[in-house]
Amino acid sequence: MGKVVILTDSSSGIHQAEAQQLGISVLPMPFFINGETLFEDINLTQDTFYEHLTDGAEISTSMPAVGDLTDRWDELLKEYDEIVYIPLSSGLSSSCETATALSSDEEYEGKVFVVNNQRISVTQKQSVFDAIRLAESGKSGKEIKDILEDAKFQSSIYIMVDTLYYLKKGGRITPAAAALGTLLKLKPVLQIQGEKLDAFAKARTVKQAKSIMIKAVKDDYASRFKECQDEMQLCIAYTGDISAAMEFHKEVEAEFGITDIDRKSTRLNSSH
């Protein structure tokens, strides 16, 4: 059995130091801030990113450059026989589709396996952990890809949006909808199950939005994930406000009776 390495991008929330500890590779996502290209966790720190965000900087994101991706593949294939690449969901970025096309080139075919399992942030990170475990158990790159894709709908993400500004800026809602939502002081709750980011519910307060998310997860536990509750992982991702995240963490622990909930900050989501 050949040596298999796991590669993901920084939208998984895995930083370079953690990647080194895990024995994997992480491709940094590019951010364009006031016309300058910066790379997450390379020359863009978390503190600097949120300073730019607070100051109203022009921020956008992009998929990793093709050259950067193939250079990383070439580098890894000098040491490993196969690469399992777990990029950002194909429903939210074209990076997965581009990588899949590149992996069919003669020099990468049968060596690079691109996983299209519709994950982002904490669910993408869990896919990385699953891939590591599968590789350690002796699975091939293709076997890991197939297993992860077979389980692509076994996840749910619920997101509370405190401001509609970035959804409007990114073109995910119309200016009119953003203006109306702001006027009514709405706190949308969004959902990711599979490919797309969809509206799930509307709340008037942060407290109500948090209650909606907790109930939604409980409903998923009782229905969609009823047969695999013992294997489920519960995670919290947040943007910027660590004190609010810690408060919500305690609420979720109390509701579910779980004390090993993972909590991570995510920059990619903040810019959208």
Where are these regions (language model features)?
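A short glycine/small-residue-enriched secondary-structure motif
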Residues: 44-50, 73, 78, 100-105
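Short beta-strand segments
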Residues: 7-8, 87-89, 115-116
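Glycine-rich phosphate- or other oxyanion-binding loops that anchor nucleotides, phosphorylated ligands
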Residues: 56-90, 97-98, 145
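A general structural signal for short secondary-structure boundary/capping elements
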Residues: 51-57, 73-74, 132-134, 161
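Mixed-charge interfacial surface used for oligomerization/domain docking
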Residues: 3, 11-25, 30, 82, ...
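N-terminal glycine-rich anion-binding loop in soluble enzyme alpha/beta folds
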Residues: 5-63, 68
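Detector for Asparagine
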Residues: 34, 43, 116-117, 269
